[in-house]
């Protein structure tokens, strides 16, 4: 039987990220099409080579075709039929999808139905799925949802204290995101500790950021809510605020509610306080960004304390992942120091270079603390393989 390659696709409103794997789950190539609809930029990495070029992408369709042509042009594949499986990251599956799913007429219709819950994400994701269904007719397509891991959150944790019809008629509730990352971290540590199920507090800290309480291997609670805007202070997102601010600013500045929410998503967070959304720049200049760093660290620490309480103080590890959690040692140290009274201990000597994971807690620490490099693309590959194999059976 011919061994098929597996493509992982992450489509956004103005960008598409790709990773191509062989049947041994090894990365063959990484691609990026960004600034779609504007001026266009393309990047491809393979065999220790890197191609970067400006390309006009008028829509997602042209971006997909350019990437697939680049794979053939650079002899990464000979024919498109070599790609037998495509895993699509889909942000919003609501509480309907409790697992990854083979894309068919029904599942695609549901993804489109949930565009109203995540218009910036589900629409381009649905569009790109349809493009691949046409471009590579022989491939199976699997949708892997950010929200799936959080469908185990109990009702008392996902329900908002709002009128009942908001949930019943408009699907307003906590969904949570970064689920693929949390699933990867949980499974990685199950293997590392040779123990399952685990209790974990995982901080996924990147430009977007959230915290998740995992109880017995399942999501118990998470800081992001109905949208990724809730929770931690992020690169450009405000995180938790008083909701009455939205109508107040709309009235005061003669803006629509959508305009205000757009500013909370794209012009707030660390960007609003420091003028930069790049966490590396911010934490490299602590003397200039002192207030912003304190706000950021305090918010993460508050969620760690909250979730430790919800887990009755019984956890196998506190985990830091995502671009900031994996690499910004100064930031992680500050957060751990902020929760030292709860029994978490570290020191700067433990923050060296590492590959997949690194223990950063001291012997005196009540709890283990790890940094773990997440791999959402590999998790999507594994979910896609599992779902497509089950279909064959």
Curated annotation (Swiss-Prot):
Cellular compartments per GO CC = cytoplasm
Q: Does the keyword Disulfide bond apply?
A: no
Keyword annotations for this protein? ATP-binding, Cytoplasm, Kinase, Magnesium, Metal-binding, Nucleotide-binding, Transferase
* Catalysed reactions, as listed in the record: acetate + ATP = acetyl phosphate + ADP
Specify where it is mainly localized.
cytoplasm
Q: Where in the cell is it found?
A: Cytoplasm
Listed PROSITE patterns: ACETATE_KINASE_1, ACETATE_KINASE_2
Binding, substrate? 89
Q: Which residues cross the membrane?
A: none
Q: Which cofactor does it need?
A: Mg(2+); Mn(2+)
Q: Which amino acids does the record list as binding ATP?
A: 17, 204-208, 278-280, 323-327
Question: Its function?
Answer: Catalyzes the formation of acetyl phosphate from acetate and ATP. Can also catalyze the reverse reaction.
State how it assembles: Homodimer.
Query: What protein name does the entry list?
Result: Acetate kinase
Protein source organism: Mycoplasma genitalium (strain ATCC 33530 / DSM 19775 / NCTC 10195 / G37)
């Amino acid at each position: 039987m011919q061994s098929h390659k597996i493509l992982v696709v992450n489509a956004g409103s103005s960008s598409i990220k790709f990773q191509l794997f062989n049947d041994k789950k090894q990365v063959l190539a990484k691609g990026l099409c960004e600034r779609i609809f504007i001026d266009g930029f393309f990047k491809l990495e393979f065999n220790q080579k890197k191609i970067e070029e400006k390309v006009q992408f008028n829509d997602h369709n042209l971006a997909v075709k350019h990437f697939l042509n680049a794979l053939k042009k650079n002899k990464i594949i000979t024919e498109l039929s070599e790609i037998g499986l495509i895993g699509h990251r889909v942000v919003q599956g609501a509480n309907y999808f409790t697992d990854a799913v083979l894309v068919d007429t029904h599942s695609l219709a549901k993804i489109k139905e949930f565009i109203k819950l995540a218009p910036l994400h589900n629409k381009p994701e649905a569009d790109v799925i349809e493009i691949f269904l046409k471009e590579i007719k022989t491939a199976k397509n699997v949708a892997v949802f950010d929200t799936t891991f959080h469908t185990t959150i109990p009702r008392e944790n996902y329900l908002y204290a709002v009128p009942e019809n908001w949930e019943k008629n408009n699907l307003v509730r906590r969904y949570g995101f970064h689920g693929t990352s949390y699933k990867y971290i949980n499974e990685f540590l199950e293997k590392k500790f040779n123990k399952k199920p685990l209790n974990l507090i995982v901080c996924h800290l990147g430009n977007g950021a959230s915290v998740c309480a995992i109880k017995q291997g399942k999501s118990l609670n998470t800081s992001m809510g109905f949208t990724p805007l809730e929770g931690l202070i992020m690169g450009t997102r405000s995180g938790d605020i008083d909701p009455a601010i939205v109508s107040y600013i709309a009235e005061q500045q003669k803006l629509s509610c959508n305009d205000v929410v757009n500013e909370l998503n794209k012009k707030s967070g660390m960007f609003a306080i420091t003028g930069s959304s790049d966490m590396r720049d911010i934490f490299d200049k602590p003397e200039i960004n002192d207030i912003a760093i304190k706000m950021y660290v305090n918010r993460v620490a508050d969620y760690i304390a909250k979730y430790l309480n919800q887990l009755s103080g019984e956890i196998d590890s506190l985990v830091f992942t995502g671009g900031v959690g994996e690499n910004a040692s100064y930031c992680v140290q500050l957060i751990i120091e902020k929760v030292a009274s709860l029994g978490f201990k570290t020191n700067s000597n433990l923050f060296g270079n590492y590959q997949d994971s690194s223990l950063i807690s001291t012997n005196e620490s009540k709890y283990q603390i790890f940094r773990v490099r997440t791999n959402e693309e590999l998790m999507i590959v594994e979910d896609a393989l599992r779902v497509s194999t089950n279909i064959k059976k």
